[in-house]
Amino acid sequence: MSRIGKKPVPVPAGVTGSVEGQTVKAKGAKGELSFVVHDEVLVKMEDGAVRVDPRDQSKEARSKWGMSRTMISNIFVGVKDGFEKKLEISGVGYRAAMQGKNLQLSLGFSHEVVYDVPAGITVAVPKPTEIVVTGIDKQQVGQVAAEIREYRGPEPYKGKGVKYAGEKIVRKEGKKK
């Protein structure tokens, strides 16, 4: 039994939610999102909350039950508050800057890395060593942050590279003489 799936998803104040067949739509101050629920899962609106139940007791239905509930919860939180992911850059000469709508990264390569920011995502650079990715779609915010981190992930010896804020890098000891 999914313990997460049992809980109905409350529709927050300031957000309008609707269920049309297998599609859940949310509209709030930050924008509009929708999620198409898998056919193995039943979804219905009950007294200001979205209820999610498995269609039957098959393994597929039960495995998609909790995930569907969490995805619906994420679209409600996204249109109300939005999501944010912070990245930190460490290393000599490593820095970031916005160039119009593109993110320009100096990461020790012979060339500048230019990242084209997708629609629906906002990237800010408060400091040259800090990047803030914001948006209403949690999956897209995480994907953009992961793509930026992938250009130069943190290395284990000196910790140089792009890492998530608060990420603990497992350090290795260098060679001994």
UniProtKB/Swiss-Prot annotation:
InterPro entries, A to Z: Ribosomal_uL6-like, Ribosomal_uL6-like_a/b-dom_sf, Ribosomal_uL6_a/b-dom, Ribosomal_uL6_bac-type, Ribosomal_uL6_CS
Kindly give the HAMAP family that the UniProt entry links to this protein.
Answer: Ribosomal_uL6_B
Q: Which cysteines are joined by disulfide bonds?
A: none
Recite the UniProt keywords alphabetically.
Answer: Ribonucleoprotein, Ribosomal protein, RNA-binding, rRNA-binding
Transmembrane regions: none
List, alphabetically, the GO terms of the cellular component aspect: cytosolic large ribosomal subunit
Biological process according to GO = cytoplasmic translation
Q: Which gene encodes it?
A: rplF
Q: What is this protein called?
A: Large ribosomal subunit protein uL6
Q: How does it assemble?
A: Part of the 50S ribosomal subunit.
Q: Which Pfam families match?
A: Ribosomal_L6 (PF00347)
Source domain of life: Bacteria
Q: Name any one GO molecular function.
A: structural constituent of ribosome
Please give the family membership noted in the entry.
Belongs to the universal ribosomal protein uL6 family.
- This protein's species is Brucella abortus (strain 2308)
* Function in brief: This protein binds to the 23S rRNA, and is important in its secondary structure. It is located near the subunit interface in the base of the L7/L12 stalk, and near the tRNA binding site of the peptidyltransferase center.
